[in-house]
Curated annotation (Swiss-Prot):
Keyword line: Ribonucleoprotein, Ribosomal protein
The protein, known as: Large ribosomal subunit protein eL32
InterPro entries registered for this protein in UniProt: Ribosomal_eL32, Ribosomal_eL32_CS, Ribosomal_eL32_sf
Signal peptide extent: none
GO cellular component, one term: cytosolic large ribosomal subunit
Amino acid sequence: MAIRPVYRPTIVKKRTKRFIRHQSDRYDKLKRNWRKPRGIDNRVRRRFKGQYLMPNIGYGSNKKTRHMLPNGFRKVLVHNVRELEILMMQNRKYCAEIAHGVSSKKRKTIVERAQQLSIRVTNSAARLRSQENE
């Protein structure tokens, strides 16, 4: 049986579109990644009507649902079994995510221990070799 979170509120994002950089559509050398405009005459900085919107504190998420995954858990990065056991009492609130640099041998032990402790692992299938390949 899969572990379910304590409660699963509806996660509301105030804005899902990305904020794009001013004039990034005009020049290829300007990437779309957001940069704050700092020019004295810049219309985006001065918030003229019809211009790109700037990110500000008002777009922030609800404090209760911030950093929450769609399944209702918050993820914690885990490098070894000892770090996994910290989540033992909080397994209905947090789920584990195995770090990128962990070897496939250690991943296997982490996933097995997580099943014993009934902790959900988000990337449990990653880099696990099957029997026929060995």
